[in-house]
Amino acid sequence: MNLSSGKNEKNTTLTAENQTIIFRLTALWALNDCGLGGFLHALNVPFSGLIIGGIAVALISFIAHFSNVNKGVILNSLIIVLIIKLLMSPHSSVTAYFAVSFQALCALVFYRILNINLISILFVCILSFLESASQKLITLTVVGGMSFWNAIDVFVENISKQLFADGITHASLWLVGTYFFIYFVFSVLLAFFIYSLLEQFKKMNISKRDNPSLWQFENVTVAKPKKHLPKWIKILLYSGIVVFVICTFFIYNKEQFYNSFLIYYFARTVSVILFWYYIVMPYAMAFVKKFLNNKIPAYQSEVDEIIELFPKLRLIVYYAWNQTASYKGLRRLKHFFTITLFEIISFK
């Protein structure tokens, strides 16, 4: 259960209590990345994608805090999370591994340079969420091409002209701007929340706290998680993009709709999808799997311990969700994560 024993950087100054806390935080990070998303969907939690990313950044920040921003500890925790993700979510895309790694490396860089304070937490949260937002938009643009955004402009402009005197122009820019703004606002709120929670932990003596026993969580009802969307759903979504673009230009901009455009756009989109799913993704995932499989022997005991801990963590997560039933919206999410963190760190 010693996460500071990897090859990256050793730190013998970590207390046994801090090593236990870091181990449990790493376990919760792995659960969050591998299975908590499905459980939040099952609980009908809104904006679960943003919440999963927010929880990950918060947990990385707490691991950095309890390890005194030790590079070896943070990187070891990251590798363990990636290995568990490979074992338990083998169909995850390579972009998911990149996002997790980016969050951890971003935290490592800024916390080591600026220490852990409100400014560095803001940098980590904002960059992590902007990377996540950019990743989705880049994928959409690669698959749909600029014609997709042009189709949105044409579609919204023509619809808005039927409702208002002046049509709405450059709708795609407004859409992308709003999308980034939502991610930015959420990241700023998250940064202030992480900072305030860290300040609470600094004032709290965990060793003298009344630690709960797991029997308190045994009667908690655990909902069945929803499965990840199969690949054919994504392909169907991309097909919908093609149909949307073609229909929009055909209905509202016939002078630009001609046979060569139809053939070109259809061939381009199909080629991109085939290239992405059958060449880029398999080779990228092969590299990721080879790297992580080489790491498994060195981390096998920690990985096994964390996977065995998952059922207990799930009980605590549902206990925390039930305990916050009287709260609504972001207030409930705030108390939910706070209770989850306190209970997981301190249970016997």
Predicted regions and their residues:
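Hydrophobic transmembrane alpha-helices
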Residues: 2-86, 90-92
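Charged, low-complexity cytosol-facing tails and large interhelical loops of integral membrane proteins
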Residues: 3, 56, 307-348
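Membrane topogenic helices and adjacent juxtamembrane segments
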Residues: 1-37, 165-170, 195-206, 220-223, ...
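Membrane-embedded alpha-helical hairpins and interfacial helices in multi-pass inner-membrane proteins
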Residues: 121-200, 223-239, 243-266
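Short helix-perturbing small/polar motifs within transmembrane alpha-helices
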Residues: 2-4, 11-19, 24-29, 98-140, ...
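Juxtamembrane/interface segments at transmembrane-helix termini
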Residues: 196-200, 278-302
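Juxtamembrane inter-helical linkers in multi-pass membrane proteins
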Residues: 203-224, 294-310
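Alpha-helical transmembrane segments and their membrane-interface exit regions
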Residues: 55-62, 83-86, 101-112, 128-131, ...
